[in-house]
């Protein structure tokens, strides 16, 4: 516990009136050789009513003199013991250090407070467990170059230690020490200085790295693949957007090529691309544009590349389309469409490739982005035999109502030029028909139209099945009308198989008495009808 005197000394800031030397000595507020000692504020002292010092500076002075009484007083005033130890080292007061040794803790914590290399080394010696390597590492951390110079020969004998100290100096960014090690000692690997320079975007460290690299190249016989190293540095600098680093590398023989600018594009550093784009061949710019699409570069970067090509990309259209589809990068398509002059429409080409190779989700996204009609996509899907797409896009566009779906798909079949595509749409229509509940009297008109549609497109088997279904609805008069109209279609379009099916139904209806001889003769009186049917059966039955 504190004594009453200590409590008074600790908490009295301003003395009530000037006290005599004897009273001050009794209070412990007298510093031999200096005079009265008074606390001012939280961290200063007044000496002999005249001089003001920080408490820690006063501690250093007291430690240097070995005045333990003043040290104890200043510690009561919340001074830092480390300054007393520094002063004791300066005055070689090891007896004072011994008294406080257990309170010091880690001596390394005192080192940042020391400016004098000799005191620095003496302080480090207080720690019995440390060796020369520990001293040298702390010398690097705290910029004590003279200590390193003092132990130069010892460092030189240990190549591994040299490398360790060099790398530590790089991480601590101690340029003077790095330069000294680089010129005075042998460094096996220089990579660390560049790694740290890139990590902290420290240009001065990067320049120093090249200074040491060129010194090493010119003075040592070691083989260094300088072109590869320069290229690597350029790519790294481009990826980090460090133009000044790139310019420094170029001074030493670096060359900006496609891989370097690709790194700038990938990490969205347009200013670097803009700085060098006019220094590379046109062929390289085209490759960079393709890569920019792949990397989904922003609008400004794409426009920069397109502008340098005068928006003339016809020779790489196929590759552009490929990259747009593979990497889902459609911005280039929009930019080319926005041009008033030299406009290039890649929508159809991209859409065709999407329909052929991509997923339903990708296609729908593209349709939404470029306002593509479902009819357009369904026709493409039919040409590529992608039944699933036809079904999914149809339902997404027109709902899941069978009659609506069939109506729209029939319209597409009428305008479809590709026969295989038309057949697939008809197949889809029939699939919808078979999986719906249309075979009811209420759907008679729709089934009638569907049968005529099949007849118009020579869909023989589907026509036959729908006719059978339609007959099952028991609408004799309408069935006869359907059969006769379909016969006319078959004759006009030269569909013999449809005509044969109709002829079979005509005979059936005649035997049932649902159609007269006159109606048959009238229907079969069409031009060229005799090439499709033989009326001898009718004459034979009449007689």
Swiss-Prot record:
Keywords: Early protein
InterPro entries reported for this sequence: MGF_505
Pfam families reported in the protein's UniProt record: DUF249
UniProt key word Oxidoreductase: no
Disulphide bridges: none
Domain of life: Viruses
Induction of its expression: Expressed in the early phase of the viral replicative cycle.
Function description: Plays a role in virus cell tropism, and may be required for efficient virus replication in macrophages.
Family per similarity comment: Belongs to the asfivirus MGF 505 family.
Protein name: Protein MGF 505-10R
């Amino acid at each position: 516990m504190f004594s009453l005197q200590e409590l008074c000394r600790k908490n009295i800031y301003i003395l009530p009136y000037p006290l005599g030397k004897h009273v001050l000595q009794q209070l412990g507020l007298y510093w031999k050789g200096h005079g009265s000692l008074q606390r001012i504020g939280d961290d200063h002292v007044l000496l002999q009513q005249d001089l003001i010092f920080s408490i820690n500076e006063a501690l250093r002075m007291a430690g240097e003199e070995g005045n333990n009484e003043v040290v104890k007083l200043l510690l009561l005033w919340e001074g830092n013991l480390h300054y007393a130890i520094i002063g004791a080292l300066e005055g070689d007061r090891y007896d004072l250090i011994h008294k406080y040794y257990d309170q010091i803790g880690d001596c390394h914590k005192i080192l940042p407070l020391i400016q004098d290399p000799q005191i620095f080394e003496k302080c480090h010696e207080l720690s019995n467990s440390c060796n020369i390597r520990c001293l040298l590492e702390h010398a690097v951390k705290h910029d004590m170059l003279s200590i390193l110079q003092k132990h130069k020969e010892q460092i030189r004998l240990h190549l591994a230690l040299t490398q360790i100290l060099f790398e530590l100096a790089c991480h601590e960014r101690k340029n003077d020490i790095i330069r000294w090690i680089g010129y005075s000692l042998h460094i096996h690997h220089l990579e660390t200085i560049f790694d740290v320079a890139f990590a902290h975007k420290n240009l001065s460290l990067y320049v120093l790295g090249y200074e040491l690299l060129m010194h090493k190249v010119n003075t040592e016989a070691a083989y260094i693949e300088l072109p590869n190293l320069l290229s690597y540095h350029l790519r790294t600098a481009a990826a980090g957007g460090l133009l000044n680093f790139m310019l420094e590398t170029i001074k030493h023989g670096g060359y900006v090529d496609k891989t370097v600018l690709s790194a700038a594009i990938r990490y969205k550093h347009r200013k670097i691309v803009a700085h060098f784009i006019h220094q590379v061949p046109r062929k390289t710019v085209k490759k960079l544009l393709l890569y920019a699409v792949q990397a989904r570069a922003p609008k400004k970067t794409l426009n920069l590349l397109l502008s340098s090509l005068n928006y003339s990309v016809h020779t790489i259209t196929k590759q552009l389309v490929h990259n747009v589809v593979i990497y889902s990068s459609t911005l280039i398509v929009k930019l080319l469409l926005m041009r008033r002059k030299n406009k290039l429409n890649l929508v159809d080409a991209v859409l065709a490739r999407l329909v052929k190779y991509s997923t339903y989700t990708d296609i729908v996204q593209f349709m939404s982005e470029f306002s593509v009609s479902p009819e357009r996509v369904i026709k493409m899907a039919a040409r590529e035999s992608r039944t699933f797409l036809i079904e999914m896009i149809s339902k997404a566009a027109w709902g899941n109502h069978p009659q609506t779906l069939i109506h729209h798909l029939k319209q597409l079949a009428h305008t479809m030029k590709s026969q295989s595509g038309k057949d697939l749409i008809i197949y889809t229509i029939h699939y919808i028909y078979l999986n719906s509940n249309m075979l009811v009297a209420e759907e008679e008109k729709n089934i009638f139209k569907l049968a005529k549609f099949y007849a118009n497109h020579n869909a023989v088997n589907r026509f036959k099945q729908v006719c059978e279904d339609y007959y099952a609805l028991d609408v004799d008069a309408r069935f006869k009308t359907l059969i006769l109209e379909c016969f006319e279609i078959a004759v006009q379009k030269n569909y013999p198989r449809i005509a044969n099916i109709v002829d079979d139904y005509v005979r059936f209806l005649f035997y049932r008495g649902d159609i007269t001889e006159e109606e048959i003769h009238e229907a079969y009186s069409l031009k060229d009808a005799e090439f499709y049917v033989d009326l001898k059966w009718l004459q034979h039955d009449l007689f």
